[in-house]
Amino acid sequence: MKEKIYWLIKKVPLIMRIYIKKYNRFPRKTNAVNMSGIKIRHNQVILNGKNHVFCGMDCSIQNNKFVIDGNENRVEIRDNVEINGSDQQTIFMQGNNNHIIIESGCRISNTSFFIVGSNNKITISKNVSTMATEFHIERDNNTIFIGENTSMHGRGTKTVHFALDEGTNVVVGEDCMFSNDIQIRSSDSHSILDFGGGKRLNQADDIVIGKHCWLGLRCMLLKGTEIPDYTVVAGGAICTKKYTESNTIIAGVPAKVVKRDINWDRERFSVNVK
């Protein structure tokens, strides 16, 4: 019986509109929010200004709150995406011309997107999985790019936290794996000054993480850090510079290369691979 009802909802646009209206709280401007599907439920979207939220086919978007204040802000959720907000505020934007893109096949759970500023962009590429992750942007012209097949699995309050400010970029390559309680910070958020002349000493800077990198528990990547491909960042490491050697383990405070000629795999092997 339930399958027949769902089939009818999918086939008849009027019934779909009634279903969406019953189980969600969307603005009355129908062209501002384009979301439909039997798994679009218990969401609240608040738009103040000229903004747009678009959702593709076969998505499951449930228990989220989107608050967007400003003009020309866009949220694009592509096909076959799951976003479960557990009744939390999933997206908050305040500013103009900000853009969030979540590509097809992503699985997003208990993850927040926070933007206060203008001309910022967050791109989550195909088949990315996030849990207890925070994307936090302040001021203008910042970008976050997460490569395909990357996983970020925080636990409860031990989140994976991205903090960007002052027009910086954070790039994460494809097939990376993040543990929990991790900090990625392109700015110190406050100023350290030369005592004599008042010159600022801690300028914000970009962070780049190569492909197939594994970031361990409680590690921290600070402004100006670059992690090469096929790198393991050990638990508790604090990275503060550009590392140049691939296939290494980086560990310590401050972090340095402690082992070379390594690779890693998501699978836990009980015996040697070769």
Please state what every model-predicted region is.
Residues V232-V233, I249-A251:
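Short-chain dehydrogenase/reductase
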Residues C106, L221, A237-C239, A255:
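Short coil-to-beta-strand initiation/turn motif
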Residues M1-N48, K259, D265, V273-K274:
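Membrane-proximal basic amphipathic "stem/tether" segments
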